[in-house]
């Protein structure tokens, strides 16, 4: 998505700060220290947050993170970004192969949409990918969580229009305006 935006003319540097198996609570603990090093010195910034799937995975018969803690963690990140003048965008957890995880991720996604709505933060729901045959086949053919290229292209198709609108409205002018 960032590469496509650069190709469309946005002068953009993207930092992926994901850590495998990190939950929203883990991200909330470390996000500020990691982003403050990168987002400074007068440029325009934005924070894209995509968490939640690791929260809904069962461990010992329970989700790794309760929905309430997940929502509080995301709210804390969004409030911290807002306090620093950094616009935020949230991408909901995508569906996987496990039906229980799909249902829990969809419920969490609805909660995340609410957290974002209260803060006027754009939110991208990815739950519709559960009905996308390409996404479903690619996730099933892999590790049950991650698709390959065609699946990620489906995810990007959901995120990209919202991301570009967010860039233009909140982060930086569109290439045509600069």
Regions found by a protein language model. Give the residues of each.
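Surface-exposed alpha-helical segments enriched in charged/polar residues
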Residues: 36, 75-79, 110-114
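Generic structural signal for well-ordered alpha-helical scaffold segments
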Residues: 32-36, 78-79, 160, 164
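Catalytic His-Asp segment of secreted/periplasmic serine-dependent ester chemistry enzymes
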Residues: 94-178
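Conserved SGNH/GDSL esterase-like catalytic core that processes O-acyl groups on lipids
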Residues: 1-72
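A generic structural signal for well-ordered alpha-helical segments
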Residues: 5, 81, 115-116
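Active-site segments of SGNH/GDSL-like serine hydrolases
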Residues: 50-57, 78-108
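Conserved beta-strand segments of alpha/beta enzyme cores
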Residues: 13-15, 87, 120-122
């Amino acid at each position: 998505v960032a590469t496509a935006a650069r190709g469309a003319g946005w002068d953009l540097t993207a930092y992926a700060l994901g850590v495998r198996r990190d939950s929203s609570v883990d991200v909330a603990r470390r996000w500020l220290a990691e982003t403050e090093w990168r987002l400074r010195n007068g440029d325009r910034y934005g924070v894209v947050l995509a968490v939640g799937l690791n929260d809904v995975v069962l461990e010992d018969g329970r989700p790794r993170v309760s929905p309430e803690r997940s929502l509080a963690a995301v709210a804390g990140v969004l409030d911290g970004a807002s306090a620093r003048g950094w616009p935020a965008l949230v991408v909901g957890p995508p569906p996987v192969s496990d039906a229980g995880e799909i249902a829990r991720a969809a419920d969490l996604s609805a909660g995340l949409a609410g957290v974002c709505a209260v803060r006027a933060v754009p939110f991208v729901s990815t739950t519709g990918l559960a009905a996308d045959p390409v996404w479903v086949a690619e996730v099933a053919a892999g590790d049950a969580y991650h698709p390959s290229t065609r699946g990620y292209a489906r995810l990007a198709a959901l995120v990209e229009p919202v991301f570009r609108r967010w860039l233009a409205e909140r982060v930086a002018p569109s290439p045509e305006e600069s």
